[in-house]
């Protein structure tokens, strides 16, 4: 006969294997439901993107008194509906707006900066119409220049499921603008 220890190992092994199978089925069916709902083609509208750019001499922005860096504060309007991202396996959705641009030193390198983010805990809070909102985070680059190059603003999302892997994507609406160079007040004197 089998000992008590062997029986326990057999039962726990079977239970663990069945649990992993159920979790895999949950993750697969919730992902298939997202594909069926066409969530990877969600539309959003980013508009009225404005900036106030200044020179920063603080060390935290990579600048100094001799070599200041450009820092830009963004204001924008956004309109999006993430209710289709919620199904029975969605715990919450993380939405964020990024600014994407090419680097000066290596023009084939794309830089991406997050300027705004929001955690959406339920389907009831998934529709937004933001007007004239300030970005949470300022734009600045290690190369000390963020202006006079095209920046493409996009709205991204990540789904945190109860079971399974994180699912991420971006909406189809994007907006490209070029920030204006700030006026250096010390050079004008």
Swiss-Prot record:
Q: Subcellular localization, per the record?
A: Endoplasmic reticulum membrane
Do the record's keywords include tRNA processing? no
Q: Which residues are glycosylated?
A: 125
Q: Does the keyword Membrane apply?
A: yes
Give the UniProt record's GO annotations in the biological process aspect: protein targeting to ER; signal peptide processing
Q: Per UniProt, what is the membrane topology? A: Single-pass type II membrane protein
Membrane side Cytoplasmic: residue ranges: 1-12
Q: Lumenal side: which ranges? A: 36-189
Q: Which UniProt keywords apply?
A: Endoplasmic reticulum, Glycoprotein, Membrane, Signal-anchor, Transmembrane, Transmembrane helix
- Briefly state the protein's biological role: Essential component of the signal peptidase complex (SPC) which catalyzes the cleavage of N-terminal signal sequences from nascent proteins as they are translocated into the lumen of the endoplasmic reticulum. Essential for the SPC catalytic activity, possibly by stabilizing and positioning the active center of the complex close to the lumenal surface. Essential for viability.
- Describe the protein's quaternary organization and the partners it interacts with: Component of the signal peptidase complex (SPC) composed of a catalytic subunit SEC11 and three accessory subunits SPC1, SPC2 and SPC3. The complex induces a local thinning of the ER membrane which is used to measure the length of the signal peptide (SP) h-region of protein substrates. This ensures the selectivity of the complex towards h-regions shorter than 18-20 amino acids. SPC associates with the translocon complex.
- Name the chain's protein: Signal peptidase complex subunit 3
Q: Which organism is it from?
A: Kluyveromyces lactis (strain ATCC 8585 / CBS 2359 / DSM 70799 / NBRC 1267 / NRRL Y-1140 / WM37) (Yeast)
């Amino acid at each position: 006969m089998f000992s008590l220890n062997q029986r326990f190992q057999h039962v726990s092994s079977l239970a663990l294997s069945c649990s992993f199978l159920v979790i895999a089925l949950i993750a697969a069916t919730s992902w298939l439901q997202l594909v069926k709902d066409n969530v990877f083609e969600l539309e959003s509208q980013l508009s009225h993107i404005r900036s106030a750019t200044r020179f920063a001499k603080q060390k935290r922005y990579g600048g100094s008194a001799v070599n200041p860096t450009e820092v830009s504060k963004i204001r924008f309007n956004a309109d999006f509906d993430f209710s289709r991202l919620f199904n029975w396996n969605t715990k919450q959705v993380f939405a964020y707006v990024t600014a994407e641009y090419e680097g000066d030193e290596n023009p084939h390198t794309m830089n991406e900066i997050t300027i705004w983010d929001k955690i959406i805990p339920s389907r009831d809070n998934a529709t937004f119409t933001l007007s004239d909102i300030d970005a949470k985070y300022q734009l600045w680059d290690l190369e000390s220049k963020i202006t006079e190059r095209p920046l493409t603003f996009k709205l991204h999302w990540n789904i945190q499921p109860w079971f399974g892997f994180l699912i991420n994507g971006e909406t189809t609406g994007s907006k490209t603008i070029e920030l204006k160079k700030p006026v250096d007040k010390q050079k004008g004197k």
